[in-house]
From Swiss-Prot, chains A, B, C, D:
Keyword presence, Ligase: no
EC number: 1.2.1.11
Coiled-coil ranges (or none): none
Biological source species: Saccharomyces cerevisiae (strain ATCC 204508 / S288c) (Baker's yeast)
UniProt-recorded name of the protein: Aspartate-semialdehyde dehydrogenase
Main location, first listed in the record: cytoplasm
């Protein structure tokens, strides 16, 4: 596979790791070579180490890879490493990899709030990757060896929340009030053990530890402008935008649904039709860059009264497309709408792969 | 059963009708004698006419009742008639019953918006029954025969929404901004055929026809004051309160969960602890009147981070208690909280029975 | 699309019809041109007529086809017509089509028991299509116009049941005792309205009308030999094989699981390993014929203790592969095993398409 | 509470322990005083130690009990101890309790196969308690202190399987062939963590570790006669009865459904009606003894074509009643039928409490 970048996956036996492996199988630009997991799995063939729970079969390309421990020494040949590590382990491991000069795209929450770490939803704020470009250029200019770096994938439900906001803000100006109530899929809680069956059969759980804080905080970083020197992002202040999230777990395997309400700062607010048109016409930069996984239609605006629904819409554009429906006026704010995003693809591993494709397109790896 | 009032049920084979029958079985004050359903069922024993779908067994008291057609002539002996009729049939039938002098407590939406028809959540606005008292007194004063009347049970999710608001408004003054996103049980859609299995397995439906409009409108009637002459309710105006609802169907059999946010008009807003204390201390008038089904604890304030949950909390006080949890500050409005109510008991048939108990306590039947 | 056969679908808006349309979209040998449905849908664009419930999006190739009534006059150009009609309508309509000289592959039960109508599971008994070949040859020899014919797709769970039996019987001789207990997906009950949500949430239904009789009868036709004159099938007698089925509906969208036990007539019975090897080595005739949809691995033998499972295995070979696991000795009969088949693909519409591919390969259309 | 026996529960925070606590709350004959759990919970109030997952609220009687470690020294005052311990811990702990002279009714599998330990389904083989009576009498006759003893509750699905067989065997003689395919509720797998949500949403699992062996073995002990000297049970031999089980997990919270087939040794076999009548007329000894929890109707024979169903029938007689439906002839054996039993009541904790009531009625505690 001449010309392909070598990829590694950390946390390869976990739910996000499994999804990375699926997405990297037969990828035109990346060749999956190194899989890292716990010492319990290290030394085994991947097929023997993993409890595969994806509905797609385990790709042959990963079956016989011998699992390594999560140490940078085993990942030296990698141009890019995708981390699906649990937060308990990600902090130390990813730091060690970065200090070893490795480029990491991480789904863990550990470094999301670091000023100089881009927190990216690839269909929303790819320009924040300038932080990495600026870091590489600086090192180069200083004759230093090429530094490693960490790029963080956003929280899964935040990805769905901000996706439609980007084009709306670009067109109609700032949003100063935003609420979301989520109905989140259980795959978001992973498999070890994940959401217990007894808790989600004939039930919902009105609580996901830390999720609301993540959504309320991360939205203010993702939608924020870069500092002039491109070394960091200038967080939006509470005065600029108030975000309120309420998160629930429901009996859905994949696909987070969010009931959002928003208010534009500028008066008068646009019409429902203007909002719909704006969303339909939005083409993300990743698509313009020709990235393999970038959805042609970033936001699918649905007209049926009862859509989007996870079962029927989560796989649009292979899970990279975000669906928005029931766009209507809100008696309290300006608009109410229902947003659906595939929580393990555009909400996690998929974003990671698309971020890597953007890095490749910008020669940052 | 000396001293018991005679009760009838309309729409006896439907989901709400079945719940009325369960609640009226062995009731200390009501004796179920007459069951009305479609012509298809009329003439049959109830046990042979109904496709019983309740998890409690069909009460023996109803088993052998011969089903009648829904005509007032068959219900003459009834002191009170509970209507679980579908809206398509309720309008004409309930009108005919009222004009025949019969007292009806109806779960149908048909007359909810009529000025002189009380729309009651028995743990919230029993005082609106003064409209009926005033009507009966007027007829008596004019020497006219005792008139029939219709009292409407609110929409199921509205009942859960307004239950905690009543004590808060009494204590801290008006609420001027209110949002709710619901996760509603499928029993709310009835059984003929109700929500199709294929639509709710590994899925949610972000739409319930007419529900948002009902919640936004009915809240403004239930929380409104009576007119001085007690002939009607003075609806709250949009200036007084803005209500925004987003309704979803989830894979739960019974129990509507609602993620609500609210803002008090008066500044400063109370503290979280003050809100909790207010809710805990609230005792509904129905309990003070000694009504059989009135919950001792109207609002159960739960402290666990992940409660209330339908599976674990819907049956508090046999479904008459409303649970509130996760009471916390809202970055946009004042407070966010999760409310759970049993949609076919305090949200429908249960409210009907409790309304009848209040009527009995006030000698209005 | 030169060289492609023209296809039509009857019952196009139903669940089986929708699946035919998905499978025929971009098919290398068939071009979908005519869609038939009820008079309510006739005259509308398909996209406006259907309530699309498949997890894959509605193919563009079907979107704008104007729906016809189910009359042969509108299907004259069709080389093959796939019928997903409900049994209530299939009888008369399919007869009219056959008498108009049209070739029909039908999923309806109406003609399955007719002596001269082949009942086909394409990976099991394609040789029964000789009945059609013989009928066409006879007409040709008699100088008559080319007759229409009906080929029936088997009952969905019977397809899964007989798939592993074919290779076992070929290798180890007759099976004289066969039991199956099914755990069947709700998509098998269609969408109008299909299994009610309230019946399948936190529940199973130990009954599927007519299913056990279908399984016990159809098995004896599918596994039977052709009569010498190839005009019909000589049903297996109860002395030759006793079949006992118990059918249940479970909360699974697609994929029927069956717990089967079987006994070979010949003694001694083979070993577990011999059974596994036999199943692994089996290659169906359709694959040998080069049919587009034929699975390379007809029977997937799984070694994990808890497999097959619908969620993880139903899509093997795009739903044409049948999975068998937990092959073990049975204290009462010879062997017990778990069989999983995709009930709307190899169990219904998929089989129909594969049958048509076999007809094409044998120049019977 | 004068006259009540003192009860203790081991494994009090687990799923079976929680069910024991619910059943013992307000029990007329037992007063719950001592709760044992892991060292992690010991010393805490029960309400603070447990993650309560029952749909009924935590009984006040257990709320403030300080949890003890599972050592007999803390249970000295107990007349009876109910063990919901996990098998990993039950072996050593229950042995220590027995050797300390304590009477234990255990839901763990550890001692079920010991010759001198009765394995009891209280509505089926209470006579096997003679082993305990005989042991107590012997000790008494030898002037030894009163010995402790262990009585085992059967495997949950075995309880449902054997319940209808007892009356049939009594009336029509031995059963020599018995098959069962189970559709088992997830509560049977406990809560730590129990069946993962991702494995049971839109899925079934055709495997429950060790379950089939338990059902096939335990049936032969429960249905067997006592040895003449009443010191043990003479297991039924494979020549006397062949039992074949296939076990599956389905998306049901409580209530195991079993599709069973059986053949009587004696010819001719009875008729379907004779089987129904026999089951209807059966009254278990526990009811004759006046035991509090004994179901008046041990076997509920249901006539609807699609019953029993877990959601509608599991709570018959508060979960102590077993429902049997679809009794019909089997083309291979004699009869097929569907059996439903509440897996945590008559299948576990409920049986334990009923066993204790029988012991009490027989003055064995």
């Amino acid at each position: 596979m001449a010309g392909k970048k070598i990829a590694g996956v950390l946390g390869a036996t976990g739910s996000v790791g499994q999804r990375f492996i699926l997405l990297l199988a037969n990828h035109p630009h990346f060749e999956l070579k190194v899989l890292g997991a716990s010492s319990r799995s290290a030394g085994k063939k991947y097929v023997d180490a993993v409890n595969w729970k994806q509905t797609d079969l385990l790709p042959e390309s990963a079956t016989d890879i011998i699992v390594s421990e999560c140490k940078s020494e085993f990942f030296k040949e990698c141009d890019i490493v995708f981390s699906g590590l649990d937060a308990d382990y990600a902090g130390a491991i990813e730091k060690e990899f970065m200090e070893a000069g490795i480029a990491i795209v991480s789904n863990a929450k550990n470094y999301r709030r670091e000023q100089d770490v881009p927190l990216i939803v690839p269909v929303v704020n790819p320009e924040h990757l300038d932080i990495v470009a600026q870091k590489l250029d600086t090192a180069k200019a200083q004759g230093k060896p090429r530094p490693g770096f960490i790029i963080c994938i956003s929280n899964c439900s935040t990805a769905g929340l901000v996706a439609p906001l980007k084009p709306l803000i670009e067109k109609f100006g700032p949003i100063d009030a935003l609420t979301t109530t989520t109905l989140q899929a259980i795959s978001g809680a992973g498999f070890s053990p994940g959401v217990p069956g007894i808790d989600i059969l004939d039930n919902i759980i009105p609580y996901i530890g830390g999720e609301e804080d993540k959504m309320e905080w991360e939205t203010k970083k993702i939608l924020a402008p870069l500092a002039e020197d491109k070394t960091h992002v200038k967080l939006l202040t509470p005065e600029e935008i108030k975000v309120s999230a309420q998160c629930n777990r429901v009996a859905v395997s994949d696909g987070h649904t969010e009931c959002i309400s928003l208010r534009f700062k500028n008066r008068p607010a646009p019409s429902v039709e203007q909002v719909k048109t704006c969303l339909k016409e939005y083409v993300c930069d990743a698509y313009k860059l020709g990235c393999h996984s970038a959805p042609k239609q970033t936001i699918h605006v649905l007209e049926q009264p009862d859509r989007p629904q996870p079962r029927l819409d989560r796989n649009r554009d292979s899970g990279y497309g975000v669906s928005v429906g029931r766009i209507r006026e809100d008696p309290l704010l300006d608009f109410k709408m229902v947003v659906l995003s595939h929580n393990t693809i555009i909400g996690a591993a998929g974003s990671g792969v698309l971020i890597a494709e953007i890095l490749l397109a910008r020669n940052l790896i």
